[in-house]
């Protein structure tokens, strides 16, 4: 959409640059529009420079993006905990961050393999998950 808008503004600018006889108020409006158009083009150029720089970093492999995996191992034919008293993962105590002893019934086991520390928080609240099934 940005490119479309830029093309539209460029066409407007070319039409405005043609000398026309008319009302002095119209001429002043054209000049103001041309100034506005230049500001928009400058902003677009700056944003293109920033995006191309970030793309080059990712292509060169020097970007700070890391891939994080979480393993979820669910033992079949056994029900996981549905208790509302459990905070976070069902077999990891939220206060001590230690694995709780399994209750009499089996539960789903979770393990965080790696997390990204250097990367800033994502803009989206969605998380990517990978499901791993036992062989």
UniProtKB/Swiss-Prot annotation:
Protein origin, superkingdom: Eukaryota
Signal peptide positions on this chain: none
The keyword Protein transport is annotated on this UniProt entry: no
Region (Disordered): 1-68
Pfam families for this protein: HGAL
InterPro entries per UniProt: GC_assoc_lym
Swiss-Prot/TrEMBL GO biological process terms: regulation of B cell receptor signaling pathway; regulation of lymphocyte migration
Taxonomy of the source species: Eukaryota, Metazoa, Chordata, Craniata, Vertebrata
Transmembrane segments: none
UniProt feature, compositional bias: Basic and acidic residues: 22-48
The UniProt record lists the keyword Coiled coil: yes
Official protein name in the record: Germinal center-associated signaling and motility-like protein
Coiled-coil ranges per UniProt: 26-50
Annotated Low complexity bias: 51-66
UniProt keyword annotations, A-Z: Coiled coil
């Amino acid at each position: 959409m940005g490119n479309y808008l830029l093309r539209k503004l460029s066409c407007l600018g070319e039409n405005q640059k043609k000398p026309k006889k008319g009302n002095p108020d119209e001429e002043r409006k054209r000049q103001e529009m041309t100034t506005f158009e230049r500001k928009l083009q400058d902003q677009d150029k700056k944003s293109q420079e920033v995006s191309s720089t970030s793309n080059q970093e990712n292509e060169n492999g020097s970007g700070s993006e890391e891939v994080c995996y979480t393993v979820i191992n669910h033992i079949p034919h056994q029900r996981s905990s549905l208790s509302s008293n459990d905070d976070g993962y069902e077999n990891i105590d939220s206060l001590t961050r230690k694995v709780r002893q399994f209750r009499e019934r089996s539960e789903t086991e979770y393990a965080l393999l790696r997390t990204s520390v250097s990367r800033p928080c994502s803009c989206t609240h969605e998380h990517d998950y990978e499901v791993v099934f036992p062989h």
